[in-house]
């Protein structure tokens, strides 16, 4: 794995990926789309299923089999945005805007309005998990860091399209039509349900899976195993 510092390329990053989706559904945006994805969407698909595997980047994919599905279906490689955190990246997909426009930059952010840190995806207080926003006089998610979700943008620009999302329970809902899925089995079942029962409906489905949790867990188990082996050798 290279130690080279990779800077965001805002002409070829995840922002351009979601911009292509917005462009496909006639949403006006000032950001540049991704040419490789634009070309793919020229086939005018009836349904678009957009799956985000959080944390499953290029270095991990490069260690998979050359005969595998991901390798054979690869059409491009883009950078993330800055900062390249889960919250910043996912909100780029949700808003169709970069972090420097939305203000969503970290998993936990301090707000002077509360004098507390808030987990951005769950809207809960970071240390005690309390819902301090409900009883507060101001909701920063309705003002300071508010954005228009792409689901709403798409349905406004293309009224014949129904936009859905499937996301984990820890994440706040951003679409009018939202289904929860906390593992791969639930994900696959949900996608199958959509495709089977909504074939007559044009829609956009965005799926968020926290793959980095499983990857980090595997790395932790490997480190513990290596430490155990070293201790036994001594």
Regions found by a protein language model. Name each.
Residues 60-64:
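Short, solvent-exposed loop/turn and secondary-structure capping segments
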Residues 33-45, 193-196:
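A short acidic-Thr-Gly-centered motif at the start of a beta-strand
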Residues 213-234:
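A long, amphipathic alpha-helix that forms part
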Residues 1-32, 65-74, 81-219:
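His/Asp/Glu-rich, glycine-adjacent segments
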Residues 46-47, 96, 225, 229:
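Catalytic cores of glycan-processing enzymes that make or break glycosidic bonds
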Residues 55-59:
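Short acidic, Gly/Ser-rich segments with clustered Asp/Glu that frequently serve as metal-coordination loops
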């Amino acid at each position: 794995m290279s130690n080279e510092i990779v800077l965001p390329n805002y002409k070829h990053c995840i922002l351009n990926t979601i911009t292509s989706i917005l462009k496909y559904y006639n949403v006006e945006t000032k950001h540049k789309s991704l040419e490789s994805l634009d070309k793919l969407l020229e086939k005018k698909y009836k349904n678009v299923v957009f799956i985000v595997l959080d944390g499953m980047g290029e270095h991990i994919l490069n260690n998979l089999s050359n005969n595998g599905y991901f390798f054979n279906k690869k059409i491009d490689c883009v950078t993330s945005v800055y900062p390249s955190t889960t919250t910043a990246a996912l909100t780029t997909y949700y808003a169709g805007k970069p972090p420097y426009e939305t203000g969503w930059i970290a998993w936990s952010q301090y707000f002077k309005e509360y004098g507390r840190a808030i987990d951005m995806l769950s809207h809960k207080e970071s240390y005690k998990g309390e819902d301090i926003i409900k009883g507060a006089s101001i909701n920063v998610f309705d003002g300071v860091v508010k954005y228009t979700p792409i689901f709403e943008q798409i349905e406004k620009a293309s009224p014949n399209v129904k936009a859905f999302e499937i996301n984990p329970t820890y994440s706040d809902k951003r679409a009018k039509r939202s289904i929860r899925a906390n593992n791969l089995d639930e994900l696959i079942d949900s996608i199958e349900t959509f495709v089977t029962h909504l074939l007559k409906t044009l829609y956009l489905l965005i799926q968020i899976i926290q793959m980095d949790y499983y990857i980090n867990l595997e790395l932790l188990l490997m480190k513990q195993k290596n430490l155990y082996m070293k201790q036994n050798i001594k």
